Every structure is written in C-alpha cells, then in structure tokens.
A protein has these predicted regions:
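Transmembrane helix-loop-helix hairpins at membrane boundaries of multipass inner-membrane proteins
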Residues: 2-5, 21-120, 192-214, 239, ...
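Hydrophobic alpha-helical membrane-insertion segments
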Residues: 36-54, 179-189, 382-389, 458-475, ...
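Membrane-entry segments of alpha-helical transmembrane domains in multi-pass membrane proteins
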Residues: 1-9, 25-32, 75-93, 131-144, ...
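N-terminal signal-anchor/start-transfer transmembrane helix
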Residues: 8-23, 99-100, 229, 293
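Hydrophobic alpha-helical membrane-embedded segments
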Residues: 46, 344, 425-432, 504-525
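Aromatic-capped, Gly/Pro-kinked transmembrane alpha-helices
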Residues: 74, 480-495, 517-615
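Hydrophobic transmembrane alpha-helices and their helix-loop junctions in integral membrane proteins
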Residues: 86, 96, 100-141, 150-451, ...
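Hard-cation-handling environments
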Residues: 448-510
C-alpha cells in the first residue's frame, strides 16, 4: 500500500511530459505516454487493492502522509492520501475504466489535429480525479474538484475553432463554477464550526458538537449539495451536460463514466456522517435525484443526436444515485456508480465507433441498418443498452438499480419509488428507441467498421463487465458506509424485482412497436398538436436554458451595460464636451463674408454698450 501515491503520480507525469513536449511527439509516442501512464496507474491500483484486501489496515483506513502543506495558526492541512473501501472502489473505476477509454481514444483520435494535446488534457483529468478521491482533507478534495472542472473545460472545447464548442465549454465551466462557490461556502462553514477540514476528524467531531437538525450543519450540508448537483449535473444545475457533447466522444465517456459527474455522488457518500445529522437536506438529495431522473428521461425520449441521448441518460442514472443517497442507501449508490461506469463507457465508446463509421454523422435518423455493417458495435449497444435499461438477471445494471429501488421501498418513501419506476420505464423506452432506429430499418449511410486492438479490446472488456458478470464485482464497503434501510429485510423484495423487470421489458416492447418497421404510429403521435408541443418542450430539456437566460443572463448583460456607462466618466467629460461644442459654434461663424463680419461687430458693439448702460 506504500505505492498508493503512484496511482495519481503516473498520470501527472504523463501530463507533464506531454505538456512540455509542446506537440512535438508523433501519434504513436503520444499514445504510448498518454495510455501507458493510465495503464501503470491501473496496475498500481490493482496491486494496492490486492494488498489492501489481503492485509486490511487497522480501522479499515490506510493513510499515507506525504508532507504538510502549510501551518497558519491552527490551520495545518497535510498533503495526505487515505485509502478505504470507498476510495478503492473509486480508484478502480477511474483507472480501470479510464484506461480502456484512453486505449479506445488512441484509435478514435487518429489523424485529428491536436492528438498529443488531447492526451495531455486527459492525463491531467485522471490525475485530478484520483487526487479528489484519495484526499483525506476536504481542502484537497476541493483542489481536485477544481482540477476536473478545468480539464472538462479544456476537453469540451477541444475543437475550439468552432465557436459553438467554445461556447459549450464556457457554459459547462460557468455553470459548474456556481456549484463550486456553494461547495467553498460549505467548507468555510465547516471549518468555522468544527475547526478542521480533515474528513475523518469532521465525521468524529460533528456528532459530538451538533445536534440532529442543527441550522449551521444543515446549511453546510446544503452548500455541499449545491456543489454536488453542479458537478453531477442534477437539477437545477444540469443544463451544461448535454452541451458538453461538443467534445470528442472519448471525452464524453470519461466525463460520464469514469470521472467528473460521479464526483458529486462521491462527495455526499464521503461526508455521509454530516448528512445523517441533517435529515431534511438528506431528503432533499433524494428529491433532487427523483425529479432529475424523470425530467431527463422525458428529454432523452425526443433527442435525435446519439450522444445527447446518452448524455440525458447519464443525468437520469446519476439521479438514481442521488435517490439512493437520499434514502440512506449508500452502498447501493456506489454499486450503481460502478456498474454505470461499465455500461455507460461501453455505450459512449460504441457511439464513437458509430460516429466514425458513419463519417461523423450523429443524427440517429440518418443512420439505420447498422447491425449488418457494424456487428460488434451492435452487440455492444445491445448489451450496454440492456444494462442501462436494467434488463432482468443478465445485466449488471439490473442488480444495481434493483438494489436502489429496494432500499427506496424499504425506506417507506413511495413517491420516490414511483419516480424510480417511471424512470426505469422511460430508460428502456428511449434506449431501445435509439437502438432500433440506428441499427434496424433501412440503411441510410454506408458505414465502415473499425478495426484493431485499440478498437476491439475496450469494447469487448466493457461488454463483459456490463453483463451480470460485472455485478459480481462488489465494492468493499463493509464498515465504511452505514447500512441501508432494506439491508436486513427480504420480504417483498422479489415482488419488486419482478415488477421492475416487467417495467423494463414493457419499455423495450413499446419501443419495438413504435420504432421498428414503418414507424407510422410514432410519426403520427409526433406530428399531432400535443406531440409537437411536448416534443419541443422535452427536446429543449423543459426550457431550463430559456428560463435561466431570462432570469440570469439577460439581466446580467443589462447590468454590465449600465455599469459600463460610468457617471464619473460622464461628468469628467463635460468640460471637453462644452469646449468641443464651443469650438464648433465659433467655426460656424467663420464664413469669409465682409457683411457678416460687419454685422457681427455691430451686434457686439450694441451688446457692450447695453452692458455698460445697465451697469
């Protein structure tokens, strides 16, 4: 376990080497460094994990103190790494899934301008995420938090020559910064009240210093939730995620499966002891997840861009994790985080293969019949889509989503359970809508299948992990997180499993009925007046972008224009204005005509005499 620091040091070194090369390396060298550094990190994680599970440290936590960062009064943050079952699970997801995404990216990005720059950014992305999950102090968690935010901005705007991509990157950066401000305020409150930001010390001190429902702690947890919803794209800071599809497809896989959007879930799970003392805020976590998963499900139903459909599905699945956290199903949330990483990475990488095969076409209605020309990718979409839809017994997604739904039912919160079941139906419907439209029906474009180890291996490994085999990998969370409300109850569980399975299959059957064949019924529904209204509303993600534009963007721009007109500048400019106007008046009197001058002299003489007489 003493090699723990190498897990994030390898990606950090990869970033430094690629950054200082200034793009001089060729594609082969850049890929070797970029992919190799993540591979070494994954191997180190495997070694550390075997050692940790075989020789558990005392107390279940191994702390590696590297150095003290600063000492200002009582504020003495130490640069330390903490390894327990939760951070080990996150390490495995980030490095394991991240490695296969990098390997696939080495194929996907071939021939692209900025090949070396791409791996420079992704290595820093992985290093920042690893720093986030290993830090034993919320201050260092925040540094990693900001690191993944910066890297997401760089990667979403990777094709920066297109102004739309730059705007999407800026939008993601600004919206997530709103959440980051809330998180920073939460850290300030915690340090003021508890005198430390060390996670272990926080969880020990909070129960002794705060009563349940304490206003100060509730406010701190609310601020932490604000940071989590921003980074994990939950209501009301969810608007950036769909636009983040502007980046290369492997970036989407990294953000959605292995790194950024899972950070909010990790933060709440890591600080669970604080949220347990603020039950109203914990309930709000579940409510946010329930609303988000339903709204995102409807939005995904009408999208035409293959990546945006998957983006809204991520928003919905993260909603399930928040739902689990909100009812105290801590292990269920992390289990679903892990399985979701498997099948969502598979789906995004498969989508990338489809996009390349179809000459960078992303509209599913311009595809069709791809199952014949892309049999491997079709199989990956079937397995990954089935896991996303939680097809019973054979997929990893079924076991993790069922664990969440059971804990929600055991908690007695029926409204949240209904939201989860509605979301399950919508998920299977929009997932197989995508599959049936893109891979069945009439062929719309001539596709060419990808080839090579870097293309096939990641897809095949993730395909296997998306089946029920992936569910056999259980996160080592015993003793790290509290038991959920349904951990010791079995009565009624099988009935819920059957119900959720029927719902998933019903969604697939309805998708087949609507989108296989001529699709006349689906077309007639879409062209009806209610259909057009709802599809417009859902396509625009319930109008949140428009609403925020009216509430925040336009008033802000108006305020900048008003502030730009500085009254002091205006007053200081008055003498110059009068001088200019006087000069213009005098210039107007210069006509060059003798009669005008004589008349002017006469008028002037009369005015002088009048003044003398009046005086």
């Amino acid at each position: 376990m003493s090699l723990l620091y190498l897990t994030f040091l390898f990606p950090l070194l990869g970033w430094l080497v690629l950054a200082f090369s200034l793009g001089r390396f060729g594609e082969r060298t850049s890929a070797l460094i970029g992919v190799g550094s993540i591979g070494l990190s994954a191997l180190t994680t495997l070694w550390v994990g075997i050692d940790f599970l075989g020789n558990p440290p005392e107390g279940g936590v191994y702390v590696q103190r590297l150095w003290q960062w600063m000492a200002v009064g009582n504020f003495t943050p130490s640069f330390s790494l903490a390894l327990d079952g939760l951070s080990l699970t996150m390490l495995g997801v980030v490095t394991g899934v991240g490695f296969f995404i990098h390997l696939f990216a080495s194929w996907y990005m071939r021939g692209e301008e900025g090949y070396s720059r791409f791996f420079t950014y992704t290595n820093l992305f992985i290093a920042s995420m690893l720093f986030l999950v290993l830090a034993d102090d919320l201050l260092f968690v925040y540094l990693g938090w900001e690191g993944v935010g910066l890297c997401s901005y760089l990667l979403i705007g990777f094709y920066y020559k297109d102004r739309k991509n730059g705007a999407a990157a800026l939008k993601a950066f600004v919206v997530t910064r709103v959440g980051d401000v809330f998180l920073a305020i939460g850290l300030f409150i915690l340090y003021r009240e508890l005198g430390t930001l060390n996670i272990h010390e926080l969880l020990v001190r909070a129960p002794t210093l705060f009563a349940e429902g304490s206003p100060a702690l509730s406010l701190a947890c609310l601020m932490l939730l604000g940071g989590a919803v921003g980074k994990s794209a939950q209501l009301p800071l969810q608007t950036w995620l769909a636009d983040a599809m502007a980046g290369p497809t492997p970036v989407s896989a990294l953000i959605h499966a292995a790194t950024m959007v899972t950070a909010g879930v990790y933060l709440i799970a890591r600080t669970h002891g604080l949220f347990l003392l603020a039950p109203e805020i914990l309930h709000l976590v579940g409510l946010v997840g329930a609303i988000t998963l339903v709204l995102a499900g409807f939005a995904a139903l009408v999208q035409t861009d293959i990546k945006r459909i998957l983006a809204y599905s991520t928003m919905s699945q993260i909603g399930y994790m928040f739902l689990a956290l909100g009812v105290g199903a801590w292990e269920g949330a992390i289990f679903h985080l892990m399985t979701h990483a498997f099948f969502k990475a598979l789906l995004f990488l498969s989508a990338g293969a489809v996009i390349v095969a179809c000459h960078h076409e992303q509209n599913i209605f311009k595809m069709g019949g791809l199952r014949k020309s892309l049999p491997l990718v079709y199989a990956c979409f079937l397995v990954g889509g089935s896991a996303l839809a939680a097809l019973p017994l054979v997929t990893s997604g079924f076991y993790s989503k069922d664990a969440i739904l059971w804990q929600v039912e055991a908690s007695g919160q029926s409204a949240l359970l209904w939201a989860g079941l509605v979301g399950a139906f919508l998920t299977s419907l929009y997932t197989f809508r995508l599959i049936f439209i893109a891979f069945h029906g009439k062929e719309q474009t001539k596709a060419h299948a990808g080839h090579g180890l870097a293309h096939h291996l990641p897809l095949l490994v993730l395909l296997v992990l998306s089946t029920g085999i992936g569910a056999l990998i259980t996160p080592p969370l015993a003793g790290v997180l509290p038991a959920g409300p349904g951990d010791h109850i079995e009565e009624g569980r099988h009935a819920l499993e059957i119900t959720s399975g029927i719902i998933a299959i019903a969604g697939i059957v309805l998708a087949a009925f609507l989108f296989l064949g001529e699709r006349r019924l689906a077309t007639s529904i879409a062209n009806s007046a209610p259909g057009r209204l709802l599809s417009t509303l859902w396509f625009n993600a319930w109008g949140f972008d428009w609403l925020y534009d009216q509430l925040w963007v336009k008033p802000y721009l108006l305020a900048t224009r008003l502030v730009g007109q500085d009254p002091l500048d205006w007053m200081m400019g008055l003498p110059a204005w009068f001088a200019l106007r006087g000069n213009q008046l005098l210039a107007w009197t210069v006509t060059g005509k003798l009669r005008w001058y004589a008349a002017s002299m006469g008028i002037g003489a009369v005015l002088v005499l009048a003044l003398l007489l009046l005086g």
